Amino acid sequence: MGLPIEAKDSEISKKMIIFVVILSLKTNNMDNSVKRVLFVNSEIFPYLPESPIANIGRYLPQGIQERKKEIRSFMPRYGCINERKNQLHEVIRLSGMNIVINDVDRPLVITVASISSARMQVHFIDNDDYFHRKSIYRDDK
């Protein structure tokens, strides 16, 4: 089930829709249900400058995690995100797969970094064809 959250960024005058996918998986005890959350956002602070969208991307997952839910946060790895400064490293078990988009086989590379103050990990979807640009929402060539 997707829960749309709408946020406006006055600087770029666009509406962005953020979807939180909540997956309910059964545990060994059939009476209990563990909630696992997959959070995918276009911006997460501190990896991109503060904005309404980046702040939602930063603090909403932390709030969900503090309520004892298991959460995974994902965002694109734009060219402006510094791998060394943010201590990104590749997640071998998630990388190495391919994704087919419009009949073109593309490699999937996932990197991860931590927000230590929140004890939270952020996974980055890395693909040069789609995200390797200095600007977030437009391709400045």
Locations of regions flagged by a protein language model:
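Residue-level detector of structural "landmarks"
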Residues: 2-7
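Short, positively charged and aromatic/hydrophobic N-terminal segments
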Residues: 9-11, 18-26
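Nucleotide-activated donor-dependent transferases that construct or modify glycoconjugates
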Residues: 31-50, 75-77
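A short, glycine/small-residue-rich beta-strand->loop->alpha-helix junction that serves as a flexible
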Residues: 43-56, 82-84
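A short, Lys/Arg-enriched amphipathic alpha-helix followed by its capping loop at the start of a domain
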Residues: 59-69
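Hydrophobic anchor at the start of a short beta-strand
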Residues: 69-71, 122
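A conserved catalytic-core segment of Leloir-type glycosyltransferases
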Residues: 77-141
